[in-house]
DNA sequence: GCCTAGGTCCCGTCT
DNA sequence: AGACGGGGCCTAGGC
């Protein structure tokens, strides 16, 4: 099913890639190339052997010798192929990104294949799962906590969980499924302030940050603002 | 130079990949596989044809049919290869990430190559370039602005540019080289508050957000807090 | 070592 | 369409 060329000429490789893309196949090119990105930010890749993947959604990624992220990429397309001066693959990534041009002086291997089925994924352990867990067992936040609404809207944005504590005090809960940083504290602070403005003037409002952990600076920020931290991890995570 | 196998058995592919990695080569495997990630977050990829890249830094990325990001990945290693039940590539990504296992029921193409030179990049148009531009022409921020220090430290973190406005008022400048969101406004707010606490009690402190543009909500946030927005783009960007 | 900030962030979701 | 927030974000730099 997959087709492969070894050491093709630029013309052959260009025709091969164009035909494969027209058939909805993924194209893998391995070879020596240079790349330039022109746009808001300018990036140039010196000559080196890399892997280019041209996916059926017209995403182009260029992977180098290290790292999870591609050395260069573009999506938004369309993708154009040219064989005038070596094989050149180009794609315009739109206004915010820029235009990518990859020029191969030698293609070692060109492969085209049908990426059938390569999409279905199942995920767990996200913030949504943490929310489900807290709604199922509100005492995890603190004993007596009662959720009343999720995504309750305020002028500062939607509150993850809105409810009352054991004393009946209005409480905003902000969820993070990873260790929380200062941004989470100020977001919670904005929600609490918005609730105080929204409710009648002398209303007491509490804020609780629910996350597996917080950074030291965030813990101080919370304390300074009279906010509470409650350690809860998403279900199924190893640290329980 | 690059070596290629077509439709190898699991044993052959495993030996091929192991040898290539030992030689510091990059390995590309194209074939039908399933993948599982176990850790804080659980992710499962159903059977599909994908590209696996095993890089010389022991990063493993698995690319599917769409998107810039890999469907699965691991780094931190070490990477292990096993041929007991189809070709299996595994890598432990550490505590926060999890362990990745990719099992191929069929390898269509296995390629190994030396990713020589695939590292050098030059970049421009970043926040650093915007800073250079502002330091070179401070009037871009506003007429009469005088930079005094960069990365000036405060309890809330380092201020991009610290200086005085035309009236001599202490001013904190926060730079963003892309359209700024609410996080930039609250970051600037934290810096201004920290400066007010640090300097003598009745000190006036201004805050200016310098970016090519801001979102509407951010513009309101800034106005509510008495902060200023000054539109400046990084040098060489298309919108000047 | 942890933590913070930047990114062509990407990507989903909602207005 | 733009906009906002989450992410196994990744990656570089600072302490």
Curated annotation (Swiss-Prot), chains A, B:
It comes from the Archaea. InterPro entries: Endonuclease_NucS, NucS_C, NucS_N, NucS_N_sf, TonB_box_CS, tRNA_endonuc-like_dom_sf. The keyword Lipid biosynthesis does not apply. GO terms for molecular function: DNA binding; single-stranded DNA endodeoxyribonuclease activity. Keywords: Cytoplasm, DNA-binding, Endonuclease, Hydrolase, Nuclease. Cleaves both 3' and 5' ssDNA extremities of branched DNA structures. GO terms for cellular component: cytoplasm. Its EC number is 3.1.-.-. It comes from Halobacterium salinarum (strain ATCC 700922 / JCM 11081 / NRC-1). This is Endonuclease NucS 1. The keyword DNA-binding applies. It is found in: Cytoplasm. Belongs to the NucS endonuclease family. Its main location: cytoplasm. Pfam families: NucS_C, NucS_N.
């Amino acid at each position: 099913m997959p087709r492969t060329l070894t050491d093709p000429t630029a013309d052959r490789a260009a025709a091969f890639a164009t035909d494969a893309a027209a058939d909805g196949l993924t194209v893998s090119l391995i070879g020596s190339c240079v790349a330039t990105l022109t746009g808001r930010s300018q990036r140039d890749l010196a000559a080196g052997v890399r892997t280019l993947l041209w996916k059926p959604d017209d995403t182009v990624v260029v992977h180098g010798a290290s790292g999870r992220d591609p050395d260069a990429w573009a999506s938004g397309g369309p993708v154009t192929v040219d064989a005038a001066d070596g094989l050149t693959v180009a794609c315009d990534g739109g206004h915010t990104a820029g235009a990518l041009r990859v020029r191969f002086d030698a293609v070692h291997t060109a492969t085209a294949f049908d990426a059938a089925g390569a999409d279905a994924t199942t995920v767990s352990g996200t913030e949504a799962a943490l929310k489900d867990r807290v709604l199922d067992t509100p005492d995890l936040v603190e004993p007596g906590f009662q959720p009343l609404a999720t995504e309750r809207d305020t002028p500062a944005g939607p509150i993850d969980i809105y409810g009352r504590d054991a004393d009946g005090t209005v409480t905003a809960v902000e969820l993070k499924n990873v260790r929380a940083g200062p941004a989470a504290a100020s977001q919670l602070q904005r929600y609490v302030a918005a609730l105080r403005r929204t409710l009648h003037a002398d209303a007491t409002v509490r804020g609780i940050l629910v996350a597996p952990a917080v950074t030291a600076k965030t813990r101080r920020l919370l304390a300074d603002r009279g906010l509470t931290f409650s350690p809860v991890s998403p279900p199924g995570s190893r640290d329980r």
